[in-house]
Structure formats: C-alpha cells, structure tokens
Amino acid sequence: MHEQYQAPLPVNSPALPEPFYYLHNFRAVLAWIGERYADLLDDQERAFIAAFAELPEASQALLVRMVMRKGTLFREGKLAYAEIGDTRAAVQPLLALGWVDAQPTLELAQLFGLLKKDELSQLFRDHLGRANLRKDALLERLQPLFPEARRLAEWQADFAEPVYELRCMALCDRLRLMYFGNLWQDWSEFVLADLGIYRYESVEFSADSRGFRLRADVDAYLHLFDCRQRFDLGEPLEELLAGLPGEPYANPWLEGRRVKLLFQFAQHCEKQRDFDLAQRLYRQSSHPGARLRAIRSLERGERFAEAHALAREASCAPESDAERQGLARLLPRLQGKLGLPRQARAAAPEIDRLDLCLAFPSEPCSVEWAVREHLEEPGCAVHYVENGLINSLFGLLCWEAIFAAIPGAFFHPFHSAPADLHSADFRQRRAALFEACLGRLEDGSYRDAIRCRYRDKFGLQSPFVYWELLGEELLEQALDCLPAAHLRAWFERLLEDIPGNRAGLPDLIQFWPAQRRYRMVEVKGPGDRLQDNQLRWLQFCREREMPVAVCYVRWHVDD
C-alpha cells in the first residue's frame, strides 16, 4: 500500500502555552494517588507509577497523549506532537515496558477504524469487484470473509506506517477512577480548569479525604461499570444478572450504583413485556421509584392481588411525593380490578387557569417565550426561569452548607457538587449548617447573604446555581418580590428530595416590583399536558396559597 512511510511534521498543541501541560497534570494525579491511595495499590500499579517517573520526558508525554486520546489504536502519523519530537524514538521505552505494542492483533472492525476508505478499497480490491460501497457497507460485506483477528503485517505485508496499541489503558482508567471517584470525568477537567472554562469552589479537605476506602470498592465500581457497558452493547441479561452481586454492598455509594443498575435492567424487561422478571428486579432494587414500577409491572402482568398488596404496603409509608402521587392513581384502579370498594382520591387544590389565543409567531420561538412576550407590560417584568430561579436562590443562600468539607463529600479539586448530594442523609450530615443558612430567612439577613454569594462566587461550578440565567435584575426583583416564607417552603421541599424536586417548577415568573408581588406561570402549548413533577409543584404551591397559574395556549393563524 505504501512503498515508504514518511511521518508528517508535528504540530504545536493549540490548548495551552505550556507545551507539557497535560504531562504536568498526569504527574499531579499520580502524586495525588501515591499520597492518598498507597494502601489501595497493588504491585503492578506501584510499579507503573515508579517506572513512569523514570521514563524520558518525551516518552512520558507520548504515553499521556495516548491515554488522553479516544481508543487504544493509533497510526504513528496521528501521534506527531512538536513538544515530543521523534515519535518513534519516544515510543521505544514504552514498547520495552510492554505498555505499548507495535504489532497489535487487529479484528476487521479495528482495521477499518485505522485505515481510510481508499486504503481499504485497495487492500480488499480482489473481494469487491466494481462495487463502490460506503465504509460501513464495505465492513458488512467483508465481515463474513474475515472473521479472525490478524496482525497488521498479515492484513497488509507492505503497510509501512507503524501502528501502536496502548496496552495499559485499563490500569490508567483505574487510576483515573481512584482520583475522580467516577469514570465520567476525564483528563480534560484539568484543561478546562486551566483555561478558565470551568472554575470550581476551593474546598479544604485533608490528605485522607478520598472516594474509596477499600481496594474491593474500586473493584466493585469497575465491575458495575463493566456490567452497564456490556448491557448497553446488548449482552444477554441472564449473563449479566449471574455476575451481579445478589447481596447489598456495605458501601452505601456502591450500593446505590448496584440498585440503579437493577432498576435499569428491570426497565428493559418491562419494555420487553417480561413483567415477571421486571417486577422481581424492581423488588430487589431500592432505587427511587422501583417499588412503584414493581406494582405497575405486577398490574401489567395481571397479578392484581399481589399488586394491590404491595400498593397497600407502600401507601403506609410512601418513599416520596412521587410515589404517593403514583399510588393515588394505582390503588383505585387495582381495587376496581379486584371488585373492592374504590378508595376516594383527595381533591386536588384548584389551580388558576389562564387561556390565551396568540398569533402564531412569525419567527421561530418557544411557546414559553411567546407567552412571556405577551404577559410583559409596563410595571410587570416576566422572566423565563423554569427550574433555574428557585434552585439558584437556594444554592446561593446555602452555599456554605453545600460546599462544607464533610468527610467523603470532596476528594479532588474538580467537584461541581458534593459526592453525596443525592444521598438520603445529605441534609442530616449538614443539619446545623443548613439550619444556619435557612435561619437567615427568619432574621432578614438572607438578601445580603445571597447578594454576597452572588458577587463572591459568580461563575463557580454549582449543582444548583444557573449563572447564565441569574442576571442582577432578575436577582434583585426576586429578592424584592418573593416572600421569605415562600423561599423557606421551596427550599425545604428541595432538601426533602433533591433529585425528585429540583425539576418541575413553573416556566415563567411575573414580578410587580412596585407592589412587591409575583406569580409563577406554567405554560402549555397545544397538545401539551402537565407532567407529574409539575403537578406536584403546582399542588404544593396552591396548598400554601402561593400565586401560581397554568397558561394554556392556542395559536391563531390569519387566513
């Protein structure tokens, strides 16, 4: 294919002025892990850290470049970097350590990932005739003819450009997991922080602050992550369930991941109409909503007596407002199926209704924005806030509690939220801090506290504050027009169930600054209906006589 391979000239990295920025970050991670996780490392991992420190700088940099790239297979020409220089020289120590392989065995799909279409067409010309197929169609045609993996030289003897396979990716992923406490964060966090794109709150935590206490916990996380990946790739559920621990993990955080995976497996079964397996998996899971889905699966499987018994049990102690709402629908229906007296449903508070017939927008815009434009008038400001305003005010007022250095909540510099944010004991572990923050609503100091946090923390990552939404005008109108008692009620509800209650708030908020009053408005276009979490928030507000309305929109189209 190539008579002689000539590597392209390397180019400078555009990311940061310091050419080895990524290497400095990787070294910092290794030092952090060595300081905090030495007791969780095995001999291979310790040897990796020690050997990495002894490598020439160019070899260190090349390895880190490969680790940060997508995949594990690279043509040499794709590894050309000005700061590294001669790629072939830099890779030699990595080959000697076995961290990189210069003779990888490639399946056909991997070969297709490396080569361009014209290279593939030339390589397989004897099998294609005159067919001019897309690359994916070409792979589909050739797959039955080449089921076995081969070395590159066996695929193409005269392919002159070296291909390298990274062999230590699993080890590096494990180190990344130990540092971040998860696998959804990656090495780009450092770059985004260095560039100022993301800025994080500085939390003081000690050297023993870490995400994992036991090596077995790291193993368990990786196992659950692998199960989820295999599930996404379509591996039979029976095989996955056989490898999933049947007993709860002692670590609450890992147990949360296990029961969530069971919940996701059960959802899959429910979609496949395997209601028996679905209800069994739901009942093995304590993930929020699992019990309600188990009842629903029993009902759909026409096991009405079992569904009714479980629903009665749940109604004695609902786990959340969402479950209470679902049970209020399910129980009367199940009672009807069983010929039992139907339980009367409590009457929901009357929600103010606003009906609008608006001219169809001449330019594309959302129905919420059209209503905002219609409602705004002199003396009345209208903002499209949805969940952003109340969450932001809560996040600013309670900043100290949210970012308190509670053990296990923060263990690296890139936390946008405490690791236990969704834990059942999140508030309890910070009870005094939250009470102090919320107490400002009682003594009137909350306005100054929120303004101070807005100035001091502006732009820092937060799980609650929508900086792009919360301009100073909106903030001041909210502080002037929203009663402290209403803020306290909303914030208390958020803390009761953060994952369940942080969404569902009305789309718009109207302010009448001169009168220091407000109204929240949920907007529904033609064919839209209120979602369950929206209904719960609307009911919550009306029960407390908070001004809220639902606006139903019809479009008027001129002939």
Curated annotation (Swiss-Prot):
It comes from the Bacteria. Residues 443-555 form the VRR-NUC domain. Changing residue 507 to A: Loss of nuclease activity. Mn(2+) 1 binds at residues 507, 522-523. Its EC number is 3.1.4.1. GO terms for biological process: interstrand cross-link repair. Pfam families: FAN1_HTH (PF21315), FANC_SAP (PF18081), VRR_NUC (PF08774). Keywords: DNA damage, DNA repair, Endonuclease, Exonuclease, Hydrolase, Magnesium, Manganese, Metal-binding, Nuclease. This is Fanconi-associated nuclease 1 homolog. The gene is fan1.
